[in-house]
Amino acid sequence: MTETRTEGAPAIPVGMAIGQVVGQAETVLTKLLARVLAEAGATRETYLAMQRMLVHGDEAGRDAYVRDLGDWLDLDLWSAGELADSLVSEGLFRLAHETIRLAPAGAELRERIRRGIGDLMAPVWEQLDPADVETTVRTLRRVTTLARDLRPAADGAR
């Protein structure tokens, strides 16, 4: 499949169709997220780092977490390490014996953000078909994986 039709429009390349729709959704959702984060007093990077820690069960070896954080946020190892260290110094994470974990203050902040996003977006999510959401998430994950594989080896060597 190299072309697609959207809402009766002429056929356009699949990448262009996906890029336009994802770009529009990202712009709108990023602005809404920024509002919630501002109300919570958090940065986007802090929020994303706390979300990534959730994937690790709220604790991980520091080096493994920094590598994972760098990969997911597309940061070099130095920047990912600086981000992790700043979260420790802010009291949102704790570091002990090379294990980094979410601190109670971080858990409270993440929950406040989660509630804010949930309250704001609930009317939108309620209108979506769960099967469509599942397909969209699966497709975007696959696109992300395939696109990451296109990066030069040197770019991926963090």
Task: Please report, for each region that a protein language model flagged, where it lies by residue.
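Membrane-interacting alpha-helical segments
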Residues: 8-15, 98-103, 156-158
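Charged, amphipathic alpha-helical coiled-coil/dimerization segments
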Residues: 85-138
